[in-house]
């Protein structure tokens, strides 16, 4: 499984902004193809986009949508996509067009002994404003309960969504404040306890996969005395195609997961055009990097 977070920003044919799609095609997808070709022949491979496949900036762009689909579909792997906030921006038209081009916003599928659930947790409440941490509507909770009720309990479940459920600073009124001192002002989703109670029944275990933040983070939470990790994936576009790194310093890239039955037998981050053995860079003490602001155009 290859989780990727693309993010495109071209609203027109501006040659500068067209480079977003070009970089994804000639860098990210080219690197993914190299990774796939390095695997033993016959290895089943599939991809997951963690959302933000496109950014419309106030107008639907059929040409951009087509270019993105072509890029995402240019390898031999089957790819599934979660819808992100920028794929819809609070507009029914954008969400409908995304469904026409990519598929439903809430769906599930099986691969081997793993059951994937992809769900739209971008809850818009005023124009383009959305809750962070992510939230679910009642109808989605009903659908999720029905889906999991039909799933064999010896499978592993991987819940895929865009906005983290375990931390955010633009909360819904029922979101729960985080109690750690370094997380002051941040919250967990009002649905988190319910989600974990539904997932805990699976003997094969479960994982939480998200994107959205443009930094890499395994956020640890305690649920009923157990440590639970939410895997927040860095973005293929880094700091929105304005550099070669995410805002935390993680290089543009994607993740590679290997499964044996219900177990993740291997996992590594693949920096674009870096060897997979490249996993860390050390800097001298007192070297400052600003990871809180987006780079200027």
Residue positions per predicted region:
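Active-site glycine-centered loops adjacent to acidic/histidine catalytic or metal-binding residues
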Residues: 4, 51-52, 84-85, 162, ...
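Short, well-ordered beta-to-alpha junction loops that form the rim of enzyme active sites
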Residues: 121, 160-165, 212-213, 269-270
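A short C-terminal boundary segment appended to hydrolase-like catalytic domains
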Residues: 247-248, 255-297
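Extended active-site neighborhood of metal-dependent phosphoesterases/phosphodiesterases
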Residues: 56-153, 175-207, 215-259
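Short acidic, glycine/proline-rich loop/turn micro-motifs
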Residues: 10-15, 127-131, 170-173
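N-terminal active-site segment of His-dependent metallophosphoesterases
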Residues: 1-59
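Short acidic, glycine-rich surface-loop motifs adjacent to enzyme active sites
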Residues: 148-175
């Amino acid at each position: 499984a290859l989780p990727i977070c693309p993010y495109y920003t071209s609203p027109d044919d501006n040659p500068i902004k067209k480079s977003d799609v070009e970089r994804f095609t000639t860098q990210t997808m080219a690197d993914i193809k190299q990774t796939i070709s390095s695997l033993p022949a016959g290895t089943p491979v599939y991809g997951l986009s963690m959302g933000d496949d496109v950014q419309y900036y106030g107008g639907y762009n059929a040409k951009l949508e087509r270019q993105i689909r072509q890029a995402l579909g240019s390898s031999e792997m089957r790819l599934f996509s979660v819808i992100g906030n920028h794929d819809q921006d609070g507009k029914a038209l954008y969400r409908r067009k995304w469904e026409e081009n990519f598929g439903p916003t809430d769906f599930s599928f099986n691969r081997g002994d793993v059951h994937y659930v992809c769900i739209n947790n971008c809850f818009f409440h005023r124009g383009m404003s959305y809750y962070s941490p992510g939230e679910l509507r009642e109808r989605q909770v009903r659908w999720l309960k029905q889906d999991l009720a039909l799933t064999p309990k010896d499978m592993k479940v991987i819940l895929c969504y865009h906005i983290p459920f375990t931390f955010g600073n633009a909360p819904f009124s029922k979101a729960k404040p985080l109690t750690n001192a370094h997380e002051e002002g941040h919250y967990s989703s009002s649905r988190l306890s319910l989600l974990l109670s539904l997932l805990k029944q699976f003997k094969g275990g479960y994982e939480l996969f998200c994107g959205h933040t443009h930094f890499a983070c395994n956020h640890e939470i305690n649920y009923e005395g157990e440590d639970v990790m939410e895997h927040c994936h860095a973005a293929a576009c880094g700091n929105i195609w304005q550099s070669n790194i995410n805002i935390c310093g993680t290089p543009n890239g994607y993740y590679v997961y290997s499964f044996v039955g219900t177990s993740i037998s291997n996992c590594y981050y693949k920096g674009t055009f870096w060897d997979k053995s490249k996993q860390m860079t050390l800097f001298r003490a007192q070297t400052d990097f600003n990871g809180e602001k987006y780079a200027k155009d």
